[in-house]
Amino acid sequence: MTPLSALTSNPAPSPPPKFALGKCPATAIHVVSVLRPNRQRFCYEKTDAGDLIPHKCLICQPILTEKHISPYYAVYSDLLEDFVLFGYNTMTGKMEQFIYAFKTDCFVEVNRPEIKYNPAFLVKGNVVVALNGPEGELVVIERDCRGLLSKESTSYGQFRTLPTAALRTLTLQDLERDRWDRAANSDEVKISSGNESFDRLYAEYQKNLPRFQVRQCLHLNKEFLCVYSKTSGDYTRLEYIDETGDFQKISCTLCTCEVTESNLIPLYVERNASELVIHVHNTENNQIEQYIYDVRTFGFVQVKRNLVYDPKKITSGLNLFMAENIDNRKVYMIMRGRDGRLQKETSGSGGFEKMQPVAVKTFQVQWVEMKTEFEKKKASTERVEPQHPVQTEGEDIMETVLAMVESFNCDLRKELGLTQDQEIPRKAPRVESAETEENIVKNLEKLQIAKDPEEPTTAASEGGNTYGYQELDDTMSEGLLEKEAESKHQDANEPEPVKNVTYEPDVAAMDKKKKRRELKSRLNKINAQIDELEKRRMERAGKKQVVSSSVPSEEAAQVEAPASPALAENTNQISNEETPKIDIFEGYNGSFLFGTNTSKEWIVEDIRNHMVGKLLKAFWPRIQNVEEMNGELFKKLIANARKCETEILEASNDRDEYYRLMQLTVDQILKKTLKKDQRATEHNHQQPTQSSDELAKNHEKN
C-alpha cells in the first residue's frame, strides 16, 4: 500500500492552461494560443478593433496536413468547374471546403459561401468521391480506419497510395500573396483628442498596457480573455467556444476590465509643487502609476509627473495624507486599508466615516472624454447651414404651379399611352365656373364614386377600380388643384384692364372647397365600410387563410377547381347565403384567355380564367345559361370582368394578396347586385297589390 507521504510528495500535475500569452518570434506581434479539445494549440492575433483573427505565421501555427481532415461528401461547383470536398478540420474544429490539385497532389482550401453544408449528403461508405485527372488518372478519396482522409491513385488499372501532403489553407494563401505584410494589423494607430501633448502621453501609456489578460469569471465559472482595443481604448471580454472554434463576447455583466480603487495598492506619497502624488501598484495592468486625489469629484486621477519611482521610499503606515475641500469645509483622509488597498474617509458629525469608491480616471478615461468633446466641437464648427436662393413670393408660387402642371402631364401621358416625347392633345377652351362644376360632377360620375355613404358602389361592373378609393381621391384632388393652378396661371398671363376693383367674396370657390370636403369625408366613410366588409369576411372564414405557396401544374389545369380552400369556402358560403347555386358556363366551352402574358410568375392563366368566371357570376347571378344572354352584353361583361381581374392582379404583390382582393371585390359586387334585386322585387310586388285593391273597390261599387 502506498504511504500517504508518497502521495503528498508527488502531487498530480496541473492541467495546461487554456490560454497562453506570448509574442511571435518572426513578426514580434502579441499572440494568444488557445488549447483546443484535440489537445492542440492554435494561435490568434488581435486587430485594432479588439477582434481576434487567426495568426498568419508558419512558425507559430501548426502545419495542417491531410490527416487533420475527415472527409464527409463532395459536390460539383459550376463556378469552380471542379468538385468541392466538405471535410471536418480536427485542428480548427470547423467544417471547411477543399478542392484537389492534380499538379501538386494536395488539397487547397476554398471559401464558397453559395455552397452550403448539408448533413443529408453525408457519405456512409468509405469511398467519398472519385476524381478524374487531366491525363486520364483517377484519384479516389476515401476514409481510413480512423475516419481521416486518405487518397489512392490508379493508372492503367494499378492502385497506389498517395503520400500525405500539407494543406494549402487560406492562411498560407494569404502569406503567399503578401508575405509578412503586417500593415493591416499593426499596433500603430493614429489617435487624436485635440491635445497633442496629451496624445503623446497617452500613446506612451498604451505601449505599457498588456494586449491580452486572462481572467476567471466567478459568476459563470468560466475563464475568459480580455483583448485591448486601441480604437475604443477599452478591453473586450471574449470567451472561446469549443464546439464552434470561435470567440464570442462573454455574457456576464458583472465582470469588468476597468480600473477601480480596489485595484490600486498605495506604496508611498511624494510632494510635487503644491500637490501630493501617490505612487501605486495597479493590479489591473501590473504597472507602477501616479495618482492625485480630486476633492471635487471625490476620486483619483492618473497623472504623469517628473518623479522617479524609488522602492526604498515605500511606507507601511496606514495614514497617507489629508486633503481639505474649501467649498464644503470637509476634511478627507486618504489611508491604506487593512487589505493594503486605498481607502477614503471623510469627517462627519460622529467622526470620520468611510466613503464609497468611485470610478478612477485613468489616462484611458481622460482620453475618451477629451476625444468626445473634441469631436463635438469639430462637428459644430464644420456644420454648414444649407444656403437657399432668396425667392420672392411670386417666384415661389410660379415654381409650385409649374411642378403641379408637370406632374399632371406625366399622369395624363400614362393614361393616354403617350411617351415623354409625344405631345398631349390640346384641351378645350376654359369655361366659366358653373360649367367647370358640371364637368367635375360628370367626371365624378364616370369614376363611379358613391354619393350615398350608406351604399358603397363598385366600379368593377363598369370597368372601374374596385379597391382604389383612396387612389381616386388623390387623383381627383390633383385634378382639381391642377385646374385651379392652370386658371391662376392663365389669369396671371392675361393683361387685366384698369378698373376700380372692389372686394367681393368668391362664392364659387367656397362652394368648390365645400364640395371637396364633403367628397373627401364621403370617401373616408367608403374606406371604412370596405374595411368592415373585409373584417366580416374574415370572421365568416374563421380568421384563417389557407393559401398554398405554389400551384401544381395538374391542379392548375382544372379551371373549375378553386385556387384556395379558404377562397372556395368563403365564395361558396356567400353564394349559399345570398344567391342560389348557378353556373352560367353551362353550354359554353370557350375560355377567357388573355392576349398578353403577365409578368407575375406566381399566377397561371387557368387560375385567372377561373377568377374571371367568379366575377361574371357576381355581375349577373340571375342568368342560368350563357345562351339566354345577348351576344353584345355577354362580350361587355367579359371585357369588364377581364379588366377588373387585370387591375387586381397588377395591384397584388403575391398570391395571398391577389386572392384577398378578388374575394373582397366579389363580396362588394354580390352585395350591390342583391340590393338591386331586392329593390326590383319590392317594386314588382307593389304594382299587382295596388291593382287588386282597385279591382276590389270597383267590385263593391258595382
Swiss-Prot record:
Q: Where is this site: Required for interaction with lgg-1 and lgg-2?
A: 105, 246
Find motif (LIR 4) and give its ranges.
469-472
Query: Care to name a GO molecular-function term for this sequence?
Result: protein-macromolecule adaptor activity
Extent of Polar residues compositional bias: 458-468
Locate the compositionally biased regions of type Basic and acidic residues: 675-685
Q: How is it modified after translation?
A: Degraded by autophagy.
Q: Which SUPFAM superfamilies match?
A: Kix domain of CBP (creb binding protein)
UniProt entry keywords in alphabetical sequence: Coiled coil, Cytoplasm, Nucleus
Question: Where does this protein chiefly localize?
Answer: nucleus
Query: What happens after mutating residue 298 to A?
Result: Abolishes the interaction with lgg-1 and lgg-2
Known consequence of changing residue 109 to K?
Impairs interaction with lgg-1 and lgg-2
Give the span(s) annotated as Required for self-association and interaction with pgl-3: 39-160
Name the phenotypic consequences of knocking out this gene.
Answer: RNAi-mediated knockdown results in the accumulation of cytoplasmic aggregates containing the P-granule component pgl-3. RNAi-mediated knockdown results in the disrupted formation of P-granules in an atg-18 autophagy mutant background.
Q: What GO cellular component term, any one, is given? A: nucleus
> Which subcellular locations apply to this protein?
Nucleus; Cytoplasm; Cytoplasmic granule
Do you know which PANTHER family this protein is assigned to?
Answer: IG-LIKE DOMAIN-CONTAINING PROTEIN-RELATED, IG-LIKE DOMAIN-CONTAINING PROTEIN-RELATED-RELATED
Q: How does it assemble?
A: Self-associates. Interacts (via the LIR motifs) with lgg-1; the interaction is direct. Interacts (via the LIR motifs) with lgg-2; the interaction is direct. Interacts with pgl-3; interaction is enhanced in the presence of RNA. Interacts with epg-2; may be modulated by prmt-1.
Q: What role does this protein play? A: Adapter protein that connects P-granules in somatic cells with the autophagic machinery. Association with other adapters such as epg-2 and P-granule components such as pgl-3 is required for the accumulation and degradation of P-granules by autophagy in somatic cells. This ensures exclusive localization of the P-granules in germ cells.
In Swiss-Prot or TrEMBL terms, this protein is called Protein sepa-1
Q: Which organism is it from?
A: Caenorhabditis elegans
Species classification: Eukaryota, Metazoa, Ecdysozoa, Nematoda, Chromadorea
